[in-house]
Amino acid sequence: MPEAAAASAAGLPARGTLLAFDFGLARIGVAVGELETRHANPLLTVHEEANAARFAIIARLLDEWKPVALVVGLPGHLDGREHELAPRCRRFANQLHGRFGIPVHLVDERLSSAAAERQLHDAGLSGWQARKPVLDAVAAQLILQHFLDLNAHAPA
């Protein structure tokens, strides 16, 4: 069962790979990071809308990267209210845990997409069409980096 949005890394080993997901109805951004280096990178964006196709891609990623845990962004509003997509993100996290048996951590993702937009713009990707293919993967990277930063001093 996914943990609360407090994003505790309790019980994680000192080393290992993490995969993070920026869940959306049309796309899912995916990022990869390492516990030892505490660094995250964008990986890819899943453009499939059908659940079976999405989970087939995710299964291949899990087989390839062999993560010790997963991180799913949980959207919220700036005033603390839950975003309308939050229940779907929780369901996605529960499905990941149920299908694959890997620990799943939920982490606050407020403003991750806006920050990803800024980061891509600052990197010289001008125009929505240039940023769109990588936006969700960069948002997943920011979610995972936030999780790693929150737990930088957590005992392994």
UniProtKB/Swiss-Prot annotation:
Predominant place of localization: cytoplasm
GO annotations of cellular component type: cytosol
Keyword Transcription regulation among UniProt keywords: no
Subcellular location: Cytoplasm
Pfam families in the cross-refs: RuvX
CDD domains in alphabetical order: YqgF
Any GO BP: rRNA 5'-end processing
Keyword terms: Cytoplasm, Hydrolase, Nuclease, Ribosome biogenesis
Leader sequence segment: none
Record SMART domains: YqgFc
Source taxon at top rank: Bacteria
Gene Ontology terms for molecular function: nuclease activity
Enzyme Commission (EC) number: 3.1.-.-
Function: Could be a nuclease involved in processing of the 5'-end of pre-16S rRNA.
Entries under NCBIfam families matching the protein: RNAse_H_YqgF
Family: Belongs to the YqgF nuclease family.
The protein's name: Putative pre-16S rRNA nuclease
Species, as recorded: Azoarcus sp. (strain BH72)
